Amino acid sequence: MMKFKKVVVGGTFDRLHLGHKALLRKAFEVGKIVYIGLTSDDMVKNKPYAEKILPYERRLKDLIEFLEVNNFRRYRIIKINNAIGFTTRIRSLEAIVVSEETYKGALLVNRAREEVGLRPLEIIVIPIIKSKLGDKISSSLIRAGLIDPFGNPIKRE
């Protein structure tokens, strides 16, 4: 049920996995228009296994492919260079969709919005999705070669 006109979600979206997909699905479930902040190559330099993160253009292509396959049409993808991104420039945003892990980022966004006189966003939190190893599914574990994008352990030979 669409509750908001404009929602925002952000991330690196490297090697799209079940957690990313759940986050995006929730955003489209609650928002009429979804603004997606996609991190620039500069922004990901300090992430774990940064050298294995796919380049921005590839992550953008994979993200668009996922959106099209799922018939998500009402979106705008914007390159971001920091955690606040465009959230202080688009006054009409109403909500932000995050995981339990990225909840603190939503608080930073709201603080930044309030500092420039904008209304804070309603925060919608989705649970973290666990891998079959018991850890959360993360791009870092995928880049490390420990799990696949579905959370299955990768067998070493």
Swiss-Prot record:
- What highest taxon heads this organism's lineage? Archaea
Give the InterPro entries listed for this entry. CoaD_Thcocales, Cyt_trans-like, PPAT_arch, Rossmann-like_a/b/a_fold
Q: Which EC numbers characterise this protein's activity in its record?
A: 2.7.7.3
Keyword Transport annotated: no
Instruction: Return one Gene Ontology term, BP aspect.
Output: coenzyme A biosynthetic process
Its GO CC terms are: cytoplasm
Record bears the keyword Cell membrane: no
UniProt cross-references to Pfam families, sorted A to Z: CTP_transf_like
List the Gene Ontology MF annotations in alphabetical order: ATP binding; dephospho-CoA kinase activity; pantetheine-phosphate adenylyltransferase activity
Subcellular location(s) of the protein: Cytoplasm
Report which reactions are catalysed by this protein. (R)-4'-phosphopantetheine + ATP + H(+) = 3'-dephospho-CoA + diphosphate
Alphabetized, the UniProt keywords read:
ATP-binding, Coenzyme A biosynthesis, Cytoplasm, Nucleotide-binding, Nucleotidyltransferase, Transferase
Q: In which pathway does it act?
A: Cofactor biosynthesis; coenzyme A biosynthesis
The protein's assembly and partners: Monomer.
Question: Which family does the similarity line name?
Answer: Belongs to the eukaryotic CoaD family.
Q: What does this protein do?
A: Reversibly transfers an adenylyl group from ATP to 4'-phosphopantetheine, yielding dephospho-CoA (dPCoA) and pyrophosphate.
Instruction: Write down what this protein is called.
Output: Phosphopantetheine adenylyltransferase
